Amino acid sequence: MISMNISSNFDQNISRFHEILDVQKNFDIVYHTLTIADKKACLYFIDGFTKDEILLRLMQDFASVKPDSFPSSAHDFAKQYVHYGETTVETDDKNIFTQLLSGLSCLLIDGYDRAILIDCRTYPARGVSEPEKDKVLRGSRDGFVETMIFNTALIRRRIRDCLLYTSPSPRDRTRS
């Protein structure tokens, strides 16, 4: 991945994020397009790492922003309208992707040449263990026994790489 800074061109930033994160292949990388005070915005996060209640509150707060009181910088926007969790304003997309894959949410807003990183994460609280019903005779005895979202979050917690693709598809057992 070539490191470059975020630009103030929203569409260019979004196409770069979609290309690097490959949101079409990764079912656990979620993005929501929003409108904040007549400006286009996009919120990226990893499903299974974020607290839904905080994201809902953030989106409600974003809906209340008026065009005439819209801040001129990403720093000011973060101070005035992001009241939940810690925030960081970042320009280098390599750092942004590392933080995003570590569980932070990333907000891109049209006209800002910086991304707002919001820490509203929660980590899965279980290690990988042997499944009770599907014992194997040989090989690894590690298994995933929760939902696919939870299991993927357990993997992403350890492997923070844009090249880790996750796409749900049935394999050898049922194909259904």
Regions found by a protein language model. Give the residues of each.
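Active-site phosphate-binding and catalytic loops of NTP-dependent enzymes
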Residues: N26, L163-L164
